[in-house]
């Protein structure tokens, strides 16, 4: 059996001190700060990630009615990473064939995405207002009326 050292090839960027504190966040996805080509070139698609991607794209293609997916890995288990991969493939259809081998739906173009991270709990309209803004619904009565739960004051 080969050792881990024999099986792995470490990328030079792993040793780059300027990248040590680089941790991707869903905000990076929403604000288009992630290079999809580089992301998929430098990341491995695990079995769990592939399952999530295929099931989500089945939903996007209306081949499945499952609209929610529970990501229950422990902290550091790849939940954000999986969501970023899904978001990038939704936004960039040109990478789907390469990343999801055997997946091809010529009728499914770019999929609009919205995301919210708990790290931004100070968003002016909270989670639902942030999502409404991302999908172009921020001017709806649900976000503009004074009695809207989206306009409620946050505790503290």
Regions found by a protein language model. Give the residues of each.
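ATP-binding Walker
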Residues: 77-78, 122
């Amino acid at each position: 059996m080969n050792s881990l050292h024999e099986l792995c090839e470490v990328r030079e960027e792993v040793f780059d001190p300027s990248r040590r504190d680089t941790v991707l966040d869903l905000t990076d996805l929403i604000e288009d700060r992630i290079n999809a080509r580089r992301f998929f070139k430098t990341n491995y698609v695990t079995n769990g990630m592939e399952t999530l991607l295929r099931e989500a794209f089945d939903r996007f293609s209306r081949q499945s009615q499952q609209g929610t997916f529970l990501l229950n890995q422990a902290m550091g288990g790849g939940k954000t990473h999986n969501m970023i991969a899904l978001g990038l493939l939704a936004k960039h259809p040109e990478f789907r064939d390469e990343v999801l081998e055997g997946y091809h739906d010529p009728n499914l173009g770019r999929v609009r995405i919205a995301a919210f991270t708990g790290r931004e709990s100070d968003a002016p309209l909270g989670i639902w207002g942030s999502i409404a803004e991302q999908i172009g619904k921020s001017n709806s009565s649900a976000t503009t009326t004074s009695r809207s739960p989206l306009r409620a004051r946050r505790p503290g």
